């Protein structure tokens, strides 16, 4: 079973949690896109949902495939969000934001009664940090914000390269007009402390640590999909 087949397995297992008539947050990334494709097949057969996308990219795919969409202002309270992750630990703490949509992903997840994470088994880790942590920052005062992040890292005993994410024509810009600093800290032993410290920096708009947000993780491997509950 290749990586895409595992993503499809996880997406299919998550779809079983979606009930007719739900208000649904729809994530961003390759695994979430497999979920959208499967959801669209159910919608075409008469299944009713209203979706809130977490990125313009997801919105375009939903429109293309016929998944009905609303804005979060139109549906401010959601029943369920299905989204992928770059890393998942045993407590269902997550690193997200590889696709650049972490701010909207976190807003939508926070507006949901439940969040289910879908991923292939390569994303399951004992401790977060092998994947670079995306930190969304305001373009104004970028150097000062970067220095503040470095100071936070030093206080917590973390070190590593901070790189401004690039796209084909310069700095990557999020749907909200911000930039992303990818922080390669390596192992993050205290994700809660790092989250709190990053939240205190004025130039940090949001970061990719999702803590106490996911209710379930559906992890797919060669033997199929398994469901994990938070070990908190």
From Swiss-Prot:
Pfam families: Rib_5-P_isom_A (PF06026)
Chain positions recorded as substrate binding sites: 28-31, 83-86, 96-99, 123
GO molecular function, one term: ribose-5-phosphate isomerase activity
Residues at the active site: 105
Keywords (A to Z) from UniProt: Isomerase
Catalyzed reactions per annotation: aldehydo-D-ribose 5-phosphate = D-ribulose 5-phosphate
Domain of life: Bacteria
Name the record gives this protein: Ribose-5-phosphate isomerase A
HAMAP family to which the protein is assigned, alphabetical: Rib_5P_isom_A
Family: Belongs to the ribose 5-phosphate isomerase family.
Entry-linked Gene3D superfamilies: 3.30.70.260, 3.40.50.1360
Quaternary structure note: Homodimer.
Pathway assignment: Carbohydrate degradation; pentose phosphate pathway; D-ribose 5-phosphate from D-ribulose 5-phosphate (non-oxidative stage): step 1/1
Species per Swiss-Prot/TrEMBL record: Rhizobium leguminosarum bv. trifolii (strain WSM2304)
Broadest EC class assigned to this enzyme: isomerase
Isomerase is among the record's keywords: yes
Presence of keyword Chloroplast: no
Protein role: Catalyzes the reversible conversion of ribose-5-phosphate to ribulose 5-phosphate.
Single GO biological process annotation from the record: pentose-phosphate shunt, non-oxidative branch
InterPro entries per the UniProt record, alphabetical: NagB/RpiA_transferase-like, Ribose-5P_isomerase, Ribose5P_isomerase_typA_subgr, Ribose5P_isomerase_type_A
């Amino acid at each position: 079973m290749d990586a895409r087949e595992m993503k499809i397995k996880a997406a299919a297992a998550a779809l079983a949690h979606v009930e007719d008539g739900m208000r649904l947050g729809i994530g961003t990334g390759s695994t979430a896109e497999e979920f959208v494709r499967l959801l669209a097949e159910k919608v075409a057969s008469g299944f009713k949902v209203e979706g809130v996308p977490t990125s313009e990219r997801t919105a375009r795919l939903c429109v293309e495939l016929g998944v009905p969409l609303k804005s979060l202002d139109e549906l401010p309270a959601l029943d369920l969000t299905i989204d992928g992750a770059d890393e998942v630990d045993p407590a269902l703490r997550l690193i997200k934001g590889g696709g650049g949509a972490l701010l909207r992903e976190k807003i939508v997840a926070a507006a949901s009664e439940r969040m289910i994470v879908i991923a292939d088994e390569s994303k399951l880790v004992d401790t977060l940090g092998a994947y670079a942590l995306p930190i969304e920052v305001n373009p104004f005062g970028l150097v000062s914000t970067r220095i503040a992040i470095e100071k936070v890292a030093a206080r917590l005993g973390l070190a590593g390269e901070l790189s401004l994410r690039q796209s084909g024509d310069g700095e990557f810009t999020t749907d909200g007009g911000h930039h992303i600093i990818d922080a390669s800290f390596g192992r993050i032993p205290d994700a809660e402390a790092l989250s709190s410290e990053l939240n205190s920096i004025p130039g940090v708009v949001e970061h990719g640590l999702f803590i106490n947000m996911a209710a379930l993780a559906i992890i797919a491997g060669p033997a199929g999909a398994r469901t994990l509950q938070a070990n908190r």
